[in-house]
Amino acid sequence: MKILKFGFAFTLALFMTAALTAQAPMGVDYFLLGEHSKAKMFFEKELASNPEMANFYLGQIAYLEQNAQKAEEYYKKGLSANPNSTYNAIGMAKLQLKTDPKGGESALLAIAKKNKKDIDVTIAVGRAFMTAGMYKQAEKIHAEAKKAAGKNPAVYVLEGDLIFASNNMATEKAGEAGGKYEMATYFDENYPLGYLKTAQIYQKINAVLATQKLETLVEKNPNYTIAYGMLGRLYAQRGFYDRAIEAFKKYFDTGIYSTDDIEMYARVNYFSDLYDKARELVNNGLKNDPNHFVLNRYNMYISAKSKDANGLKDAEKFFSLRADTGYISLDYSMYAVILDNAQRYKEAFAQYDKAISMDPSNVDIYNDAISSARKRKDYTLAASYLNTQIEKKAELGRANDPDYADDIVDITALGYDYYSAGSSISKAPELAAEYMKDKSIIDMLAMADPSLSAAQLASNVEYFTKAYSLYYLQKADGMFDTLIARVPDSYTGHRYKALTQHAINDDTELGLAKPHYEKVAVILEKVDELTATNRRVLLEAYNYLGYYFYMKNDKDNTILYWGKVLEIDPQNANAKLVLDAMKNEGK
């Protein structure tokens, strides 16, 4: 590098132009916030209209990217545009610090001395020392700036940056640095960078405060679009997706955003179930970075949620990006949904199992597997997943509460899955045939009832179906006993107990369901205003009881219950038929 060739002839012309920061505040603020890729986009657009400023900041970015040669090229171009450019002179002096530390330091101090009445130049010199790691010199320059302009907000931003930089960006210094950034807005409540820096430093330790700072900023200056990007991220972080979307809309209107911004904007749309917009954003990001891991992740997720025909292709692309590392349980769960949508059930459940094995304590991860099994009418598998989920919930619950009890909704659902498994198997011969090939199921049935023949279970569909049905109906019966014990005054447990007993033996004359339907009737008859569901269940109970007493030739109770049916359903054909027959018998 021929840095010394330019020597510091620059020092002969330090009567300089107006501060660059005043000419392009948003681009400069991007740079000072560490958003270098966005600052670069901004200044590349400014090269033709403002080459002095644009080349200086592009040189600054190149310097921070450890590309001294490129930085020198930019600074020289800035000087070519304006040979009296103080800021590009500062850039060249900063480069000189690497090859001639004393010469570079002297050059920077000369610039500061010559421009001591220009606080922006003084601050720029302080930043040059700071980015070169010369913190003592930077602090000295900062002290001079503070003495000369103690109410200038940029002085306090530099002070906050120095606190961080000189302490290796230690998080324990966040409060101290944040205090300096807040001083910037204290002295100038309309100074955007002060709010941005404060929000940036607090976003991980106090997201509420960070959000408030940015909301204050956009209230004062609604057109300061940089703030909306950070505000969108904070809203997303706090789960306020509607607000995040509105903020990102304004931010993206600037045309200056990164692939990571696209990913975050796509994320909040995805979690708001706005899959079309999320897909549009993902596709936009993938045009520039087709192998972006997170964008490909959301591409697959969107396909899963929207049942996109290209889901399998999207999943294949996503899982090709890394060699089985960096994937999370939800990735496999979403892949399972895609396989499920493609009716590749065995593969789907294998992926659900993989997802669960990666994060077994995440009780929510079982939900899609349970739903998928029910959709396939594989209630046995649904019950298996649900039972494991209940056990995990109990394990977590007891860790915090020794008196933890299983959720009533879960008990009901598990009982119903058992009931459905037992009552529907006779209507699912393909599923029965599949189960018969599973030795673990054969062994389970034989162990539960030693009188059963394992050979018959494995070869005779009717024999297997009957044994399988009884096994799960008895499990359902036990679950509904638990439900009744927990909530005896609810009709639900009694009703399901009635259904289960009837499924075990549907001979109404035996009346296995009778006492349970009688209990249903007693409970619902006490309800002042019946819902449509209440009326339907009560009608179900009266129908069963009316038919039971009819089969028992109990005329009084037959008339009683079929009469109750007509009170609920005046046009009920069965009730009319039975009651008419009773009247005719009495003639």
What are these regions (language model features)?
Residues 1-3:
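N-terminal secretory signal peptides that target proteins for export/translocation
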Residues 5, 20-550, 577-586:
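Alpha-solenoid helical repeat scaffolds
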Residues 7-18:
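Bacterial N-terminal signal peptides
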Residues 544-547, 556-559, 573-574:
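Alpha-solenoid helical-repeat scaffold
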Residues 562-563:
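Amphipathic alpha-helical segments within well-ordered protein domains
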Residues 567-580:
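Alpha-helical oligomerization segments
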